[in-house]
Amino acid sequence: MCSTLKDTNTIPFQDAYDWLCSFEKYGWIFGLERITFLLEQLGNPHQGLQVIHVAGTNGKGSVCKYISSILQKAGYSVGLYLSPHVERFSERIVINNQEISQEDFAGLVSRVRPVVEAMKQQDNSPTFFEIVTALAFLHFKNCSVDYAMVEVGLGGRFDATNVVTPLVSVITNISLEHTDILGQEVGLIASEKAGIIKDHVPVVCGAMGDALAVIGQVASQRDAPVTWIDQSMWTRTSYDDGWQEFLVQGSFKDYTVQTSMLGRHQGENIALAIAAVEQLQMGGMYLTDSDIQDGIKAATHPGRMEIISAEPLILLDGAHNPAGMSMLVRTLWEDFSTRRCVVILGVLKDKDLKTIVSTIVPISDVIIITKSGNPRAADPSVLQEMIIALDVDKTVFVEDSIPRAIDHAKRIARQQDLICVTGSLFTVGEARGYILHIKN
């Protein structure tokens, strides 16, 4: 890792982190004025970055991971900015698979803090996400990365990341999410996501239906060429012992690739990633077929369709909206149908609880309802009542913490059972930390 700052005025890591977390109270406040001003005061570190910008409802993180891994296999230095984190804040800001160090983080905060405090004095405080975005851009600039993978936080048009002019914009797929903020219709949400499209910058998109028309119209207005990805462009050819093989149709040739990321929908994510790097190739980047194949094979994404334990078999997936839960259920039906399924479910209360519950219950043999430590976590009794209202013959338990839920699941699981932890990334993050702690 590079060292970004060596300054006697650098504050201790914990003080820096506590200061940053104090801004979580501001929540999401849309608009680019604050992040633009903040970055200007910091010398506009984002303007020198070669960015791949990724938006969408589901699959953003996986696509970012695939592209980052491909570029690294080709010998490039790659920054990766993702959100939210699963276990540690440092997961959000990564260069070549190395999370930002405590020293670098504290040094960056020491630089950003005076600017932010001055903005607060003017009643113009940036949000938590805006500050983190500025930290990521600074870190990538200081470390002179060749490319920066930047994942949209929420929406697109007014997201803090939308100050970049990327080499390529990727929109994975679009379904209902954050409807209180983005709108109640897919078309409205698509319009927000399409806000990342820039004049003359190529777009790679996997959206369908109403969203496709909206994105196509915006791209046409901005003279941005679009590569559309649909299900005819990839086929799953095999699944064996946690590995999938896909045949993916690229712009120039077909690719046979393998991935340890689970779920048939990874075919779409891989097709999006390949289409994006093909755009970079058309812009002059040198990549070999092996770079693409080896990069996809090496990519991992903790907490998303992740097998974290073999005995007992435990699957973690941060599905937190109806579309994501449907993908999880399809994977359970297709690849784990011979196993009894013990589901540990913890969801945030501002999600579409009824649809999420009604989607996961049919595949479940036993359901253990719990909650994460996040203050937005739904009350388990509310989820229990929803399951009862479905009038299905399921065994349901309630535990007041994720460690207790995991211990309970392990006690009742049979040798060939699958334990599936899902409902939110906060639930999965706590579960992952606890399971790894036990294993170590």
Give, region by region, the residue ranges found by the protein language model.
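Nucleotide phosphate-binding/pyrophosphate-handling subdomain across enzymes
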Residues: G48, Y147-V152, D159-V170, I174-H178, ...
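Beta-strand->loop->alpha-helix junctions that form or flank phosphate-binding loops
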Residues: L82-P84, C205-A207, V218-D240, T259-R264, ...
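Short glycine/serine- and small hydrophobic-enriched flexible loop segments
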Residues: L138-K141, A275-M282, G433
